[in-house]
Amino acid sequence: MSGSYPFIDIAALDSVREGFARGDAQLVLAHDLSTVLWVNGPGAKLFGYNRVEDLIEGQLDLPVATRRQIAAFSSENTSAPSAVAVRLGGGLRSELTHLHVSNIKLPDGVAALLVATQMPDNSAEAAISGLGDDSTHIALVDAVGKVVAASPRFALLDISASTLEDLIVEAGDATDRIVKRRIRTGSHSVPGAIARLTDTPALHLLCIVGDAPAQFQTAAEAVPLPDNAEAVLEEILPEQGDAPAQQAQKTHAEQPRPKTFAFDHDAPPARFIWKVGPDGTFSEISPDLAAVVGPNSADIVGRRFSDVANVFGFYTDGSIAALLLERDTWSGKRLLWPVEGTRLRVPVELAALPVYSRDREFLGFRGFGIVRPAEAEADPEEIGLALAGGIPQNRKPRKEPAETARMVGEDDVLALSEEVANDDQPAAVLPKPPLDITPTPGRRDSDKVISLLNSCAQEKVAADQAKFLKEKERATRPEGGLTKTERNAFREIAERLRKQGLANTRAESETPVSETSSIEPVEPTPPVKTRSEPIQPDETALLANLPVPVIIHSGDAIHYVNQALLDITGYESLDDIRSAGGVDVLFNSESDDGETRQSMVLRHADGSEEPVDAHLNAIAWRGGRALMLSLMPVTAADLPAPAELPAANDEEKQALEAHVEELKTILDTATDGVVLIDPEGRIRSMNHSASALFGYERDEAEGKFFSMLFAIESQRAAMDYLHGLSGNGVLSVLNDGREVIGREAKGGFIPLFMTIGKLPHTRGFCAVLRDITQWKRTEEELTNARKEAERASNQKTEFLARISHEIRTPLNAIIGFSELMADEKFGPIGNDRYRDYLRDINRSGNYVLALVNDLLDISKIEAGALDMQFEAVSLNDAIGEAIALMQPQANRERVIIRSSFQSNLPDIVADSRSIKQVALNLLSNAVRFTAPGGQVIVSTSYELNGDVVMRVRDTGIGMSKSEVEQALKPFRQINALEGRKAESAKDWRNEGTGLGLPLTKAMVEANRAQFAIDSNPGQGTVVEIVFPPTRVLAD
C-alpha cells in the first residue's frame, strides 16, 4: 500500500481506530477536498473502488453539492463530528448517505478531514476488505492472539501463536498503541507493525510487509568456491540453448552450503535466550547456543522440554518439568548438553520467569541460559556423535515455490555431500592441482560437477588432517595438560620469582614445529581429551618442581601440595597437614584484635605466620573439579608502612577521659533509657534510666540478647527494626521509631517508644527507649470518654425515637377525631364554642406532633444518624415549592412574599427533603415575625467564585446579637418583650418551641453548606445559606 502516511499510523489514531474496528467506511481527505490521504476498504467501496490502493494518493471527484457541504464544515474550528446528508453516485442510482465529518490531526500534526459512515456489514472480514496483496498482509487479532480475519495470503507467513501473543503484550504497553519491529515468520523475520484498535474487547490490526514466498527461502551463508571456479564452470557448462540446463547451473551456483561445526574448548561462557509456551514446547532459542553445541544439537524449536530432556538425557528426577508446571520464577538449574560431532557434553545453567498477558493468562516461560564450553566433560552415551549425521538418505531437498524443473546432477551432489559429512576420520589423501577438465564426448555434465566438488572435498579433508596433526603436536608439549589461563598464571609467578631472586633464570625454549611438505596417512582420530580427565604424571611432576608453593584442594579437603609448600610451612608431608586441621590451620585472615587483615597470612607448623599473596584457579583433577592455590611470599617492601600515631601527652589524655565521663553522666541523667548494642544484637551497656526502667543491673544485662527486654509479641518487631538498620535500605534513612512493649525483670510490661540509630565506628547500635505509659493512659481515657459520649447520644436518639412512636399514635387519633367532629358528619354539634374547642384541640395536636418530629430530627443530626440522600437538586425549584406552601399563610397574615431567582442557576449536591424543610422553616419564621403589610424576599444567586447563595430577607421586628445567639440554641426562646411594636400587636416570639433555627442550621451544615444570620431590631432579619463550589454542579 502506498501513501505519504503509513496505513497503520492513521488507523491507530484515536478518532479513527474504533470506527475501523467496527467496519465503518472511513476516508481522510486533505483540505482541498480532492486528495485522498487515507481510506479503508469499506470507504473505498463506498466511493466505487474495489481496492484501497486505487484511491489512496488519488483524486476524488465529489459532486459540487457534496463538496460545498463538506467545505462548510471544514471552515469550523471544531473537532466534534458533524452530520452531513449527501447523495453519492449519479443518475438514477444515486443514494442519500449520512456522512459524519470531523477535523483530525495526522501523525505529523497536519490537519485533515475524516469522513465516515456506518456500513450494513460490520463484520471483521468487511473491516479489512480491499487490503492486502502479494507483498502486504493484513489481519485482525483478538486479545488471546487468535486471528479473527486476515487477507488471503496471510496464512502463508506461518506466524506462531506465541509470536502473536508477544506482539499483543507489546502493543498494550506502548504509549502510542503501535509497535513496529521485525516479526518472526516460520524461521525468519520480516518487517511488520501491530496497533491496538479497541480495549474492550481487545482487537488489534497486524500489518506485514514482504513477499510471502520469498520469506520462506533460507538465507544461509554460501561457501566460497576457488578463484577459478567460474572459469571451470564455464568449461563444464558452456552456453547452450537448453533452458533446463541453464536453470540448473544458476540454481547450483546460488545454493548455499552449510558451514562445518567445530567445538571450541577454550571459548568463554556464552549466554543465550530461550522461551517455552504454556505446554512446555520450545518456541524460541537464540543462535548463541548453536554456536557452542552445534546447530543440530540446538535445533529444539517446536519440541516439548520433556521430549528434549529424554533424548539428550538432561536429568532423571524431573525437577525442571515440575518447575514448569508451578508457573513460578526459578533459577540455578544445571544440566549437561551434548555437543554435536563430539563425545562431550557441556554444563548449561538455566533460569526462567513466567510470562502473563494483560488478562493474567499464562503464556509460558522466558528465560536465559549460560553454557560453559571450558567445563566440558565426557559423555558416556556419546549423543553428540549421533547428532552429526549429516543429511539423511530419505530427506528430499526443498523446492522453491517458483521452481518446477529438477536441478542437473542433484542426486549425485547429495550423495557426495553425505559421504563427506559422514566421514568421521580424515582420509589419507594428498592435495591435487586445480582440476583440468576437457570436453569429453558422451560424458554427462553432472559427472563434471561431481569432479569439481570432489576436488573441493579433498582439499577440505586435507585441511582437517593438517589441523589434527597440529593438535597432536600441541598435545606432546610439556604443559599440554594445563589450560592457556593456567600456563599464563605459572609464567607470571615465575617472572615475579626471578625479580625477587627466589628462582634462577631459566630459558624457556620451545622446539619449533616443522612444516611437512607432504601428508602421511595417519591413524584414526583418538578420542578428544576433556578437561575433566585426571592430571597426568608429567603435570604432577611439573607442579612438584615449581619453586612456588601450590595447594590443590576442594573445599576443606586437600588433594595435593608440592615440596615448596612443605618447605615453607615446616610440615613433613601432606598427611601431617591433614592431621593438623587441613586448610583452616594453614591460613589466618584475622589479627589478634579481631580485625580482618588486608592480606592473607600463611601459618607455619611452629605457629609463626607469614604474609602471602594468593592466586586461585579452577582445574580438572582426578575426573572432577578442584581449585589450585598458588602462593607468593610478601616481602617487607610490599607491606604498607604502619601509620605513625602522634604521641598523646598526659594532659590531652586526662581531658579526653574527663570528656568521656561527662558524656556518661549526661546519659545517666537523661530520663530516657539508652542501650548500646553490638553488631550481633547483644547488649553492650545501658544507662541508669534503662536499668531502672527494666529492673536489671548493668552487669546483669550486658552480653545478653537485646530481644530479652521486650514482650514476646514485640520481639520480632524490635529485631526486624534492628536488622533493617544494619543495611543501607529505607529504614536507615526514614527512621521514625517503633511502639513496642517492654518486659521488666519481674515480668511486668511497659509500653515504650523506641528509636534505634547506628554507631559510626563500632558498627553497633544505640537504642533510646521512652516510657509512654502516661500517654497510653491519657489516650485510653480519651477513647473511653468518646465512646461514652457516643453511647449517651445513641441512648438519647433511641429514647426520642421511642417517645415519638408512642406519642404519635394517640396524637393521630386526637387530631383525626377532632377533625371528624368539626366536620359534623354524624350530626350537628349545636354550639359554636364546642367548635372552637375542637379547632384548638386539632391545632394543639398538630403542634405537639411537629415538636416531636423536630426533636427526633435534631437528635439524629447531632448523632450523625440522619438518613440523607445526596443528589442533584434544583435550588430554585425547591424554594418555589416552599413558597407555594407558605403563600396561604402569608395571605392570612397579610404578608407579601416576593422572589428573585437567578436564571441558569446550576444544581447543587444536597438532600432534597432537607433543603425543602430548610426553606419552609425560614419562610415560616419570616412570615410569623413580620407585621401585616410587611414583606418577605427570597432570592438566589451564582457568585463569581462559584458559590450558590440563598437569601431570605424580611421586614420583621428583628433581633439583637444576644438574641440571635440565644435563638440558635435548642429549646431557647426570646421571651423579653420590648417596646418596639404596638401594644396591640401580637407577641410572635412567645410562639414556637425554639427548635426552628437550630434545626435549620443543623440541616444546612449536614448538607455541607454554610449558615449565617444578620438581624437588627426594628429593621428585619437576613438569613444567608452558601453552598461552596464543591457542592455545585457547574457546567
Swiss-Prot record:
- Quote the cellular component terms of the Gene Ontology held in the record: cytoplasm; plasma membrane
Residues annotated as region Disordered? 500-533
Q: Which GO terms describe its molecular function?
A: ATP binding; histidine phosphotransfer kinase activity; phosphorelay sensor kinase activity
Q: Where is the Histidine kinase domain?
A: 802-1031
Q: Where is this region: Interaction with DivK?
A: 614-1035
Q: What is its main location?
A: cytoplasm
What are the BP-aspect GO terms?
cell division; regulation of DNA-templated transcription
Give the top-level enzyme category. Answer: transferase
UniProt KW keywords: ATP-binding, Cell cycle, Cell division, Cytoplasm, Kinase, Nucleotide-binding, Phosphoprotein, Transferase
Kindly give the Pfam families that the UniProt entry links to this protein. Answer: HATPase_c, HisKA, PAS, PAS_8
Region annotation Important for polar localization: where it falls in the sequence? 1-613
Localization, per the record, is: Cytoplasm
Matching CDD domains, A to Z? Answer: HisKA, PAS
Checking PANTHER family in the record gives: OSMOSENSING HISTIDINE PROTEIN KINASE SLN1, TWO-COMPONENT HISTIDINE PROTEIN KINASE
Assembly and partners are described as: Interacts with DivK.
Stated role: Functions as a polar differentiation marker. Essential protein that, by localizing in the old pole of dividing cells, controls cell division and maturation, probably through control of DivK phosphorylation status and cellular distribution, which in turn regulates CtrA, a transcriptional regulator of the minB operon. The asymmetrical localization of this protein is probably required for cells to enter a new division cycle.
Identification of the protein by name: Cell-division control histidine kinase PdhS
Name of the encoding gene? pdhS
